[in-house]
């Protein structure tokens, strides 16, 4: 944003130097990148009037001029500009004048003719990069007045780099508000005249997509003076704001934008067919823009259209098919509020940049449109004449930003900054910003935010404003004063830490994978589940939220196995996402897998592949470390697991997870030539609320008894163990181990032989043979009743 110091002083009468103002604005968060003079350094250049001209006798391109400088005698000037003519007010560099670039004007003869000065162009005075002919001044310019004084050239432009949240400062008015509150000065309100309609002409405005444009104001002005030109004072202010002059009506639009912050647009009324429609584009529609670029629209681009065609990309750039030109006599003025979300990104998508889009995508004041339209009307009528129609306003209150009001806790200023600022000082600073304090209760302010401050939404925003205006330099380094309370670690966090350390100690590598997974892989593993689809995925291979931990682990395993890793031991702790009746639920899980050769090369033993029992044994050790006693592995089927090598894991009577070998069908699909053993558990099922108690080691002897029997093949060792544990008195059974399983010759086809070893011990006395024999007899009888076992001798 480029801001003229003199223009700014019309709104707030400050006395700061350029350096002081730049430093003050920068410290307040409006970073000033540069401060530049508005014109080059020159002296003795005055306003003059060309009285008469005649051709140079010896040069076709030179003209002899008599120039009035409000002295006794006119001066003789030789000029080479094509636009010099009698009656023209010009900029005359007198003899002795110094111009930018080091040029000094002296009396001289050009082709034999006396020249007592030089008629200057805007380029020669450093007022423009390019210009044609000499500078033409207003007919009312006072002859003899110093040009610097007449054009107020002893001015500087501040180039301010605004942060995205400060959309309110994209205008002279916005910056003036800041300067006023920073210096505790009143803002000089510039009255806006309400122009009464002279004609009844209007256009119908249809807000077809009012969510994108909730307010649209317009006005017709007829019978413009085609000879009118933009006044020099306005052209100068536009130049200082970084905008070139084009046409009186267009220049007024840009001037109001710089002054008030409301971007506007003017259409040639003769090129509008019937009505104004604010709608989204139709895919394939084409529009030639004002810069000559032709764009193909789509249904994400908001356009201003008439009955038959688009006229402009809303809030970004107008179309050439409705542009105001030199012969335009009737215009339709637009002043609208566009939803920032609608405009944001569209300009960049099309490679466009405009002052309008820059303001609209950051947010303009939603209450400014009619005021800006009245201001523009007043200026156009004063410059180009014409007859104005009534203001047309269409709006949809449902989509207009509402008034922001909330209860501000002033104690947060000290909590967040450490500064103790008096309540009255806070109140003055907030009111200086235009914040209305409706009510004060203790340390609370009930506040209403002005409509132009779209960035103020909560307590923290007001704290920032207060400290910004109070002065960041008043923030002193000081020790933090706060109470420190040790954080509590949840049971789930403790379990996760324990499990992670335990698996790492067992030689497993922890993986961390995306929560987004490949739909093809996930659906192969969990075909019965519903999955949460991502609306905007990183890629099509990461377009679903994981419903289990296996997809990420298997993907990591495949990656490593294809890179000559002969042994893979992975585990991962993470969150999975279940869809239950359309509701998304999260749960924490631990999962792991084994694949490849167990152990390193060793001369004393041959290598073997990991199997189901390696992983089961690791899990049993984990459960023992967590003091989980009620754990069962119940043979069951899972779509992703081998039908004969899979089991549910039941902890404390509740289903908690799965263990098994990857289904051969999936191993083939993933091009794996070795078994993959994997498990998954709900992390919360590992939480054991029982507090472990100290128990001394028994000093009494242990007694071992072995049993061998035939049992149906479908009976598992765990079922047998459960019956035995329920039969043995109290806690005599210290260990239960299966040391032999045999199926084959000498055993019926539907049977298997199982041999188990039991260790019995009492903690308070020595067990006698009679007690042991009674216990063994009870076990055998119970097993015979439950499973029809046949005891082997």
Curated annotation (Swiss-Prot):
Protein's UniProt name: Phenylalanine--tRNA ligase beta subunit
Catalytic activity: tRNA(Phe) + L-phenylalanine + ATP = L-phenylalanyl-tRNA(Phe) + AMP + diphosphate + H(+)
Matching PANTHER family: PHENYLALANINE--TRNA LIGASE BETA SUBUNIT, PHENYLALANYL-TRNA SYNTHETASE BETA CHAIN AND LEUCINE-RICH REPEAT-CONTAINING PROTEIN 47
GO molecular function: ATP binding; magnesium ion binding; phenylalanine-tRNA ligase activity; tRNA binding
Natural source organism: Legionella pneumophila subsp. pneumophila (strain Philadelphia 1 / ATCC 33152 / DSM 7513)
One term under GO cellular component: phenylalanine-tRNA ligase complex
Chain ranges of the FDX-ACB domain: 698-792
Source superkingdom: Bacteria
EC number(s) from the headed UniProt entry: 6.1.1.20
The record's free-text note on cofactor binding: Binds 2 magnesium ions per tetramer.
UniProt-annotated binding residues for Mg(2+): 455, 461, 464-465
